[in-house]
């Protein structure tokens, strides 16, 4: 029996999670909750996508459901997580994709509606964070009802940092993510009390921004806790971002040795999560890529044997959503009683 998934919030990540689930064996989306979108519009938004292209499959809708590739998906319209009737469709795991309910207290309200586990598609202040390939072995099904899939940037940075740290040791590091625009940004200048620069036009500016992605690596990989921090630049591209990790190593190494170790990891324990390329790639070459850390050996540089800059690309929409569903599959495999 497949793991039965519910999606709360049919925005960018919610829709990408549904698309991703269709290519991952052992999972099935059976319910979606979005109080702001009717079924006809859901069909339209899933069918047409400016970034990832037209949906390659069949979609239909009724008053209270959409049918994707012959599979009927119930649609609910509740504003409050505790009122969503997940139990009606025997949902095992809810993917919390609204960006609103990111604490354990808020996210676990879904369990009141009848689901058994919740995975938050964003960083969380208090829920345990997991990154595929890095720390799934620490998941405890008996105590962890609500977990987080961390951020798209952490899903790129953590595998890269883990491989380098295991072999060469990371003494300290700074990360910069050059990040695609997201739905929270504004197309023209507007008010943004929390972040004045964030209120400037996303289509006409490179915008410096804060990010907790590097610090979050320390929660996923305790050996790196306190050793990494970072910032972001938001740039006018619709999807695909890139991480620049500049770090001081504990051991001497050549750039070729570091690249060789990353390549080894991409072909072994991180296969499907990390890839390695030595070609002259640009951001659009990684659109709809399912791996979340795509190392670019030609883009990195080294100053000396202990100071290096490493570069990795990631599809911050589809790649992240793919690992969100993969995490749900893993959680389901450990039991959802």
Swiss-Prot record:
GO MF assignments: glyceraldehyde-3-phosphate dehydrogenase (NAD+) (phosphorylating) activity; NAD binding; NADP binding
Binding locations of NAD(+): 12-13, 34, 79, 316
InterPro entries for the chain: GlycerAld/Erythrose_P_DH, GlycerAld_3-P_DH_AS, GlycerAld_3-P_DH_cat, GlycerAld_3-P_DH_NAD(P)-bd, Glyceraldehyde-3-P_DH_1, NAD(P)-bd_dom_sf
Cellular component, GO annotation: cytosol
Enzyme Commission number, as recorded: 1.2.1.12
Gene3D superfamilies: Dihydrodipicolinate Reductase, domain 2, NAD(P)-binding Rossmann-like Domain
Subcellular location per the Swiss-Prot or TrEMBL entry: Cytoplasm
Enzyme class of the recorded protein, top EC level: oxidoreductase
Site (Activates thiol group during catalysis): 179
PROSITE patterns the record matches: GAPDH
GO biological process entries: glucose metabolic process; glycolytic process
CDD domains named among the record's database cross-references: GAPDH_I_C, GAPDH_I_N
Alphabetical list of NCBIfam families matching this protein: GAPDH-I
Quaternary context: Homotetramer.
Family that this chain belongs to: Belongs to the glyceraldehyde-3-phosphate dehydrogenase family.
Protein name: Glyceraldehyde-3-phosphate dehydrogenase 1
């Amino acid at each position: 029996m497949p793991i039965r998934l519910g999606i709360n919030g049919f925005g960018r990540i919610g829709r990408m999670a549904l698309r991703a689930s269709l290519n991952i064996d052992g999972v099935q989306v059976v319910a979606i909750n979005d109080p702001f979108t009717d079924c006809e519009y859901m069909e339209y938004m899933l069918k047409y996508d400016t970034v990832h292209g037209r949906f390659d499959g069949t979609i239909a809708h009724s008053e209270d459901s959409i049918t994707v590739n012959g599979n009927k998906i119930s649609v609910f319209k509740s504003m409050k997580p505790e009122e969503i009737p997940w139990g009606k469709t025997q949902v095992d795991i809810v993917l919390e994709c609204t960006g609103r309910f990111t604490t354990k207290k808020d996210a676990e309200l879904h369990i009141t509606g009848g689901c058994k586990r919740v995975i938050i598609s964003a960083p969380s202040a208090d829920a345990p964070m997991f990154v595929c390939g890095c720390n799934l072995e620490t998941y405890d099904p008996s105590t962890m009802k609500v977990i987080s899939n961390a951020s798209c940037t952490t899903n790129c940075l953590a595998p890269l940092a883990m491989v380098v740290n295991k072999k060469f040791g990371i003494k300290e590091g700074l990360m910069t993510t050059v990040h695609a625009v997201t739905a929270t940004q504004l197309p023209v200048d507007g008010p943004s009390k929390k972040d004045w620069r964030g209120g400037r036009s996303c289509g006409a500016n490179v915008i410096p921004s804060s990010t907790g992605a590097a610090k979050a690596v320390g929660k996923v990989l305790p050996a790196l806790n306190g050793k990494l921090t970072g910032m972001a630049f938001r740039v006018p591209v619709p999807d695909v971002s890139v991480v620049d990790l500049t770090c001081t190593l504990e051991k001497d190494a050549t750039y070729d040795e570091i690249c060789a170790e990353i390549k080894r990891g991409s072909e072994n324990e991180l296969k499907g999560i990390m890839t390695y390329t030595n070609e002259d790639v640009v951001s659009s070459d990684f659109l709809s890529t399912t791996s979340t850390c795509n190392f670019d050996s030609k883009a990195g540089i080294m100053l000396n044997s202990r100071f290096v800059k490493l570069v990795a690309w990631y599809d911050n929409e589809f790649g992240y959503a793919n690992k969100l569903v993969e995490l749900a599959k893993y959680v389901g495999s450990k039991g959802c009683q």
